[in-house]
Amino acid sequence: MNNGTSPAGGETEATQTRSGFVALIGAPNAGKSTLVNQLVGTKVSIVTHKVQTTRALVRGIFIEGPAQIVLVDTPGIFRPKRRLDRAMVTTAWGGAKDADIILVIIDAQGGFNENAEALLESMKDVRQKKVLVLNKVDRVDPPVLLSLAQKANGLVPFDRTFMISALNGSGCKDLAKYLAESVPNGPWYYPEDQISDMPMRQLAAEITREKLYLRLHEELPYASTVETERWEERKDGSVRIEQVIYVERESQKKIVLGHKGETVKAIGQAARKEISEILEQTVHQFLFVKVRENWGNDPERYREMGLDFPT
């Protein structure tokens, strides 16, 4: 939905530019990352059916008329159990605190469950403009949607309510227009052609992690991470990427490798295809699997993911 023509940092003579930060808050798998990708028009945040796949703040940028909107995709809000969980939830609330507008995303198909109620309860004291976004509405009957919207607005005074399908784009254009009209006047934060503040090597690692989760959603626990250890632009215009999938135990390494390396090969093929499409370059990807015991307690790993290490 990048429909703008204004230069970054300036204003046209006819139209004053606008810009602002919009945080997306919701329970795991509410569809936050899918919505970010839909509004931006390309992938900047990974999407899987496995919950809690977004770990750090991911900023996607789109332009609507004279407005530049910076979307902050946060980790899902849930009750943390592990150190990594605590870091993710803290990061999510930190992203919301600095935003101009907060989109509260609720999975309409899941209904008014415990996660939705806890999320709404936590939003009562938030001062920023709050917008309720009911997602996956194409899977829910209209009377149920109306009841859900009424209950949510009864708990929290939302400025607006939108009913959308982030997956197929239904309702997203109206949401984009509203955000463009609601962010403050001011110069753009980023160049016109920039769609994310995430370095490409980090996005490439996130894409590989997505393919890892999609392939091994039943078998692989969350104790895994992917790091891009080498990125080389070659003279022929191609890119050589070396990445490592880190797991905590030898048994997990065997799962990721698969029989005769077939599983990691399939993960690499899927990741390479998508990275190549985004870069519009030939990609030579070399994927390794290594054991790094207790990486979930290593402060350096948290810094690499953009998370504060909780003590």
From Swiss-Prot:
The protein's topology relative to the membrane is: Peripheral membrane protein
Pfam (any one): MMR_HSR1
Annotated stretches, region: G1: 26-33
What are the boundaries of the region G4? 135-138
- Region described as G5: spans on this chain: 164-166
A Gene Ontology annotation in the biological process aspect, one of them, is: ribosomal small subunit assembly
Which residues does the record give as GTP binding sites?
A: 26-33, 73-77, 135-138
| One GO MF term | ribosomal small subunit binding
**InterPro entries in the record:** G_ERA_dom, GTP-bd, GTPase_Era-like, KH_dom-like_a/b, KH_dom_type_2, KH_sf_prok-type, P-loop_NTPase, Small_GTP-bd
* Signal sequence segment: none
Residue ranges annotated for the KH type-2 domain, each copy included: 216-293
| Places the protein is found | Cytoplasm; Cell inner membrane
List the residue ranges of the region (G3).
73-76
Q: Which Gene3D superfamilies match?
A: 3.30.300.20, P-loop containing nucleotide triphosphate hydrolases
Going by the UniProt record, its keywords in alphabetical order are:
Cell inner membrane, Cell membrane, Cytoplasm, GTP-binding, Membrane, Nucleotide-binding, Ribosome biogenesis, RNA-binding, rRNA-binding
Q: What region holds the Era-type G domain?
A: 18-185
The record's function comment reads: An essential GTPase that binds both GDP and GTP, with rapid nucleotide exchange. Plays a role in 16S rRNA processing and 30S ribosomal subunit biogenesis and possibly also in cell cycle regulation and energy metabolism.
**Family per similarity comment:** Belongs to the TRAFAC class TrmE-Era-EngA-EngB-Septin-like GTPase superfamily. Era GTPase family.
Q: How does it assemble?
A: Monomer.
Against NCBIfam families, the record matches this protein to: era, PRK00089.1, small_GTP
Query: What is the official name of this protein in its record?
Result: GTPase Era
